[in-house]
């Protein structure tokens, strides 16, 4: 199983380490052609407006949308969650606009207010330590969205079909259960496409 990590900004190496720890192959993606042959893609944290500029500069916007249209799973963490959202509070336009969610940027405060919180994640388990850094949260989730975790009544992890998103940085701890959950999604998608 080959999983790409969008390598424009953010905790790229940590995601690679998590993917490899789960027994899959990780590929850092910086060019559209590097999406070929991948089974799934991780959109890491960073700064969403900077990431958007880099996506545009490297001509990745359409190829990323095509990757999603082909039914390939995508996992967005922190800024990656913002890239996946159809609606962003205070912005007219989304980025990739793939998940039926509304997100608010930096909604837990700025960098100095980074914190860790123990989460219970549906389908993953309890006692998962979420590392929140300038984190967004999901203000509103559409009907087809499965809420996986909340913190202080705010949605911090959700899934819609082939898309998985979370507010926190799962790659910054050694608990790889959420990455394993994503790899299981990828496995299911591969099986489904081979049956077509």
Swiss-Prot record:
The protein here is known as Pyridoxal 5'-phosphate synthase subunit PdxT
Task: Identify the GO cellular component terms for this protein.
Answer: cytosol; glutaminase complex
Pfam families linked: SNO
Q: In which pathway does it act?
A: Cofactor biosynthesis; pyridoxal 5'-phosphate biosynthesis
Q: Where is the active site?
A: 78, 169, 171
Q: Which UniProt keywords apply?
A: Glutamine amidotransferase, Hydrolase, Lyase, Pyridoxal phosphate
Q: Which terms does the record give in the GO molecular function aspect?
A: glutaminase activity; pyridoxal 5'-phosphate synthase (glutamine hydrolysing) activity
Q: Tell me what reaction this enzyme catalyses.
A: aldehydo-D-ribose 5-phosphate + D-glyceraldehyde 3-phosphate + L-glutamine = pyridoxal 5'-phosphate + L-glutamate + phosphate + 3 H2O + H(+); L-glutamine + H2O = L-glutamate + NH4(+)
Record organism: Geobacillus kaustophilus (strain HTA426)
Q: Which family does it belong to?
A: Belongs to the glutaminase PdxT/SNO family.
What are the GO BP annotations of this UniProt entry?
glutamine catabolic process; pyridoxal phosphate biosynthetic process; pyridoxine metabolic process
Matching entries from SUPFAM superfamilies are given as:
Class I glutamine amidotransferase-like (SSF52317)
